[in-house]
Amino acid sequence: MSYSKIPAGKDLPNDIYVAIEIPANHAPIKYEIDKDTDCLFVDRFMATPMFYPANYGFIPNTLADDGDPLDVLVVTPYPVTPGSVIRARPVGILHMTDDGGGDAKVIAVPHDKLSQLYVDVKEYTDLPALLLEQIKHFFENYKDLEKGKWVKIEGWGNADAARAEIMKSVEAFKG
């Protein structure tokens, strides 16, 4: 399978495809899909023993501020297998900067055709407050024990802000 052949979404920016690299609640291992080989590589064993609070991946054929595809956290009732592509709906964005520059994370839920569990979630604020705190806490701290690495959380944005970031990254990819 070639992730480069997968479009960014079915109905951008409301209906996106996300290639999952790290499942929710998984061991503290950072996986990355290599953009040249489409293979799932172990990027590193995380020094901080924390797990991703939601499935983590990227939107194919996008280019974010950090030079990588746009990152997405997909909240699901079960962990999604790495390498899978899930159809999702953006509900918010976590703006942050790290040692590599701007590194925003789109927050999404499964498309309504995949699950009715999130049909009433239109904005990130419709998700449980504890989950939002867990996401923020994870990204504030997951690099704490890695020398020279840091993260600064700049705040949350709504679904419109997430959709704007998606379109910006799609246009940046097109060049």
Curated annotation (Swiss-Prot):
GO cellular component, one term: cytoplasm
Single Gene Ontology MF annotation: magnesium ion binding
GO biological process, one term: phosphate-containing compound metabolic process
Positions contributing to Mg(2+) 2 binding: 71
Enzyme class: hydrolase
Organism domain of life: Bacteria
InterPro entries: Pyrophosphatase, Pyrophosphatase_sf
Residue ranges of the TM segments: none
PROSITE patterns: PPASE
Predominant cellular place of this UniProt entry's protein: cytoplasm
Binding locations of substrate: 30, 44, 56, 142
UniProt-listed SUPFAM superfamilies: Inorganic pyrophosphatase
Reactions the enzyme catalyzes: diphosphate + H2O = 2 phosphate + H(+)
Binding annotation for Mg(2+) 1: 66, 71, 103
Intrachain S-S bonds: none
Function: Catalyzes the hydrolysis of inorganic pyrophosphate (PPi) forming two phosphate ions.
Record-linked HAMAP family: Inorganic_PPase
Subunit structure: Homohexamer.
Protein name: Inorganic pyrophosphatase 1
Organism of origin: Pseudomonas syringae pv. tomato (strain ATCC BAA-871 / DC3000)
Gene behind this protein: ppa1
